[in-house]
Amino acid sequence: MSAQPNPKAFPLANAQLTNQILDLIQQAQHYKQLKKGANEATKTLNRGICEFIVMTADVEPIEIVLHLPLLCEDKNVPYVFLPSKTALGRACGVSRPVIAASVTTNEARELNAQIQAVKNEIEKLLI
């Protein structure tokens, strides 16, 4: 593994935000508000049910997730890169690495406050 994250992976979350996002992803998985994988994330963006997108910076080649930031900017959805695909896979509750995930909207809204807090943090990174 390379020590330096890919420079194309912008914005990259710091350690505190990474932990906050991974915790929220675990809860979103519990409430069935999580889609795993680049293709599923693309579908949620196109359907307009996406709260925010998480991608990983250690994807090889990085180009397989770089279509997502463009879509996010078109749809006005916040997005962020995390350092580790293995950690994202664990948070998603699967045994394999996950390169992208999408937290989706839900009528029940148990996670609304946490989702809004994370979206605000991500938007601060994008400025």
Curated annotation (Swiss-Prot):
Q: Does the keyword rRNA processing apply?
A: yes
Q: Which InterPro entries match?
A: eL8/uL1-like, H/ACA_rnp_Nhp2-like, Ribosomal_eL30-like_sf, Ribosomal_eL8-like_CS, Ribosomal_eL8/eL30/eS12/Gad45, Ribosomal_eL8/Nhp2
User: Where is this chain primarily localised?
Assistant: nucleus
Asked if the keyword Ribonucleoprotein belongs to this entry, the reply reads yes
Q: Keywords assigned by UniProt?
A: mRNA processing, mRNA splicing, Nucleus, Ribonucleoprotein, Ribosome biogenesis, RNA-binding, rRNA processing, Spliceosome
User: Which superkingdom does the taxonomy of this entry point to?
Assistant: Eukaryota
Spell out the GO cellular component terms annotated for this protein, sorted alphabetically and separated by semicolons. box C/D methylation guide snoRNP complex; nucleolus; precatalytic spliceosome; small-subunit processome; U4/U6 x U5 tri-snRNP complex
Q: Where in the cell is it found?
A: Nucleus, Nucleolus
Choose any GO biological process term that the UniProt entry carries and state it: maturation of SSU-rRNA
Annotated GO MF terms: RNA binding
Q: Which family does it belong to?
A: Belongs to the eukaryotic ribosomal protein eL8 family.
Q: What interactions and quaternary structure are annotated?
A: Component of the U3 snoRNP particle. Binds to the C'/D and B/C motifs in U3 snoRNA. Component of the 25S U4/U6.U5 tri-snRNP particle, a subcomplex of the spliceosome. Binds to the 5' stem-loop of U4 snRNA.
Q: What is the recorded function of this protein according to its Swiss-Prot or TrEMBL entry?
A: Common component of the spliceosome and rRNA processing machinery. In association with the spliceosomal U4/U6.U5 tri-snRNP particle, required for splicing of pre-mRNA. In association with box C/D snoRNPs, required for processing of pre-ribosomal RNA (rRNA) and site-specific 2'-O-methylation of substrate RNAs. Essential for the accumulation and stability of U4 snRNA, U6 snRNA, and box C/D snoRNAs.
Record-given protein name: 13 kDa ribonucleoprotein-associated protein
Which organism is this protein's natural source?
Cryptococcus neoformans var. neoformans serotype D (strain JEC21 / ATCC MYA-565) (Filobasidiella neoformans)
The gene is SNU13
